[in-house]
Amino acid sequence: MSRNRYERGWVLAALLALGTAAAGGAEKPLAFAYRSFWPEFEAMRQFKDAGVNTVCIFAANTANSLGQPYCKYPPVWRWFGKYDFASLDKQFDDVLAVNPSANFICMVDLNSPSWLDHQLALQGHSGESDSFTMLSCACANPAWRKATGEYLAAVVKHMEARYGDRVLAYLLAGGQTDEWMDYSRGVAGRAKAQAWKAWLKAHGRAEQPVPALERLDRAAFENFLRDPATERDVLDYAQFTGDVIVDTVLGFAAQTRALIPQQRQIGMFFGYILQLTHSRLVWGGHLEYERLYASTNIDFFISPGTYSDRPMGGGSGFMVPNGTRVLNGKGFLHEIDHRTPTYNVKLDGFVSIAWMVPWKDQAETDAGLKREFALATINGSSLWCFDMWGGVFKTPETMRVVAQGKKLWERFGAQPLAGRAEVALVVDPQSARYVNDLHPLVKEIYQGTRNKLNRLGAPFEVFSFNDLARVDLSPYKLVVFPGLFEVTPEKAALLKARVCKAGRTVLFVYAPGISDGSTLDPARIQELTGTAFKKPGVSVAQRDGWTAAYAASYADVTPQALKKLAAAAGVTLYCDDEVPVFASGQLVAIHLAQGGVKTITLPVACREVRELYTGRVVPVQGKQFPYTFATPDTALFEMVP
């Protein structure tokens, strides 16, 4: 495909998605659901009693990252064109025996069974069909795509014929941990090398070999950022790696869409730019998420709550840019796979996952689950409680919180609640390709900045740079760019026209605009920010009516520094403490590790607030009210006019 045809297709998809967003925003939440790798029937009964009737079934054919089978049932995909549908049916029928009212999210395992990997190797595709660890190599392999597409079609047709409208959605799962992550780190076999040549031709680039692997592990500028003047092939290869995965996923999504009725949804794990760090930010394959988010064949995306900010006092958060998916009219499913003190750590007599640190006690479990439920409910997101290998939701106290969370989600989750954020975090996948993702600073760019904003004491939203051309930026008084390394002339014009406006504060961190898309030049940093590259601390300069804040070091971007900038910009700080706040419409959630009496400030006047888990009503005076929090605690307030 020519570059122009590719760009026209992407723009058309974006316009179609924008039309969906303009017509009514993101998809309504699909479900409050239950999921486990293993058939935890007693837990399913407890969730049924709590009003949860949607169950995710993962009829896996493959092993997990620990080498253990995902599934307790026999594999479904047994050979080319040979399927054990009796095993598939039993997994759904066993749930129906426990809960005759159950409906399903059907997760389709598109990873390679060991027999397929071995057979394709014998056909000359050695190392090019292990989709779990070498995803981009498998996606570039026509033989793998053909066999996998045939399996996908067989499963979907069978499910539609046997279970019909009990299926709410199909989840297309592949790659490392079935989250479409690529662990090949740039390795290319014959098929991927041929696909690279085709990609270069389609993008108007001269033919060149796959970059040497040792070049992928270093970068020209401070061993952190790549210079497009000398490393353009590496930047292109990073985009190609993501493109070959996205092209494959788009093909599977279109194939599935053609086999199901319109009301059935399609979802997948993708777009983890706020989570992936060491060796995965660039080479994990998720940076090309914008093409998937613009697809009319995909209805929603999924991620676990972030793994890096789960303890008490942390803000959790989606791994994907929430503002981008909303702008594209997509739904979201928040995976609550957080560990409680009762979770099962032993997969068998030899393998355990005890290194996964759980919440410490029932008080932390209650506060943590309320935090996760509030995050999903306030953002109009679906969710599932992921029981993994059992025992996570074991106590009656835990299930009482689940039942309460389900009722509140049903009441508020499907309402079109207007966001309350006055702070925007902007990620830029095009700039992220510049990063040497083996550098220790990589974890500070997006994951680290998001975790610090989690302690702002005010809500914030996350957008992608390309969203800035069409999102309404008027509510945002502070805009944060922690990784805007590439500022082309087109990007510079967009910043000037839409972002750097009178009355707004814009924070740039570490080398913003150092590249214009062709070369690196540190002098460009001062041109953009008014401050020299290496000046320590957070510098503030007035620039034509707007305020440019600049931090040369990620270490200077502390929660305290962010709160100071936000307050100076006029952002409503709901709490003086460094705590997470979620807010939209009439809902405000505040989570604390250490309780006590706190004064809460609201963005709008109201008569009183009602804490929805306890029913406690507190009067509001001058947009403020006192509230006594437990240790730890999450409170979900409804503002009463």
List each language-model region with its residue ranges.
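Bacterial N-terminal signal peptides that target proteins for export
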Residues: 1-11
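The substrate-binding groove and active-site-proximal loops of carbohydrate-active enzymes
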Residues: 29-38, 68-86, 130-150, 230-247, ...
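Aromatic-lined substrate-binding rim segments of carbohydrate-active enzymes
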Residues: 40-131, 156-158, 251-260
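Polysaccharide-binding and catalytic clefts of secreted carbohydrate-active enzymes
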Residues: 109, 117-307, 315-316, 321-322
